[in-house]
């Protein structure tokens, strides 16, 4: 619901997810685990005026309980893709595969090359705020478009706990 509010406020924004890491695995009835990601089409997003895309992934597969949340943010106009893991870990193979899919689609449309930026700074030291870091990252990038905030200084767990109260004040 939090991300839907931002989609309504920012018409150029689309949120996808939260999706498990194995989004492109085909299930027994032929559909992908997460159809929006399997069928993601850069040209369609451009036509619809959706120039900013936020995606939250869980690093567990679809048949598991969920382990750790991470986020991807695509700025189509700037030709940039940003990845945030609050632990500062490298982008997983499956998410990098999606990033490469976006890059290939851009290339097919004769658009300038998209660049992937990864956060290598560890922000999270608690064991429960990864979802909040992912939400905050997408919202911050949507509003401020400044990845340096995540690469240059640590954002503390206590700040995420305050944001949780703000985003989910019920």
Put a short name on every predicted segment:
Residues 1-70, 76-81:
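Cysteine protease catalytic domains with a Cys-His-Asp triad
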Residues 74-170:
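Enzymes acting in ubiquitin/UBL processing and closely related pathways
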């Amino acid at each position: 619901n939090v991300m839907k509010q931002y989609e309504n406020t920012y018409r150029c924004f689309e949120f996808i997810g939260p999706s498990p890491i194995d989004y492109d695995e085909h299930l027994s009835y032929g559909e992908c685990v997460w159809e929006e990601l399997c069928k993601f089409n850069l040209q369609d997003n451009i036509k619809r005026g959706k120039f900013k895309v936020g995606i939250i992934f869980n690093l567990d597969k679809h048949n598991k309980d969920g382990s750790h949340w991470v986020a991807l943010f695509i700025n189509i106009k700037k030709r940039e893709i940003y990845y945030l893991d609050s632990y500062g870990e490298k982008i997983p193979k499956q998410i990098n595969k999606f990033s490469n899919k976006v890059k290939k689609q851009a290339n097919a449309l004769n658009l300038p090359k998209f660049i992937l930026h990864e956060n290598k700074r560890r922000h999270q030291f608690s064991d429960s705020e990864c979802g909040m870091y992912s939400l905050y990252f997408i919202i911050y990038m949507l509003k401020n478009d400044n990845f340096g905030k995540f690469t240059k200084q640590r954002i503390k767990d206590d700040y995420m706990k305050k944001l949780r109260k703000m985003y989910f004040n019920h």
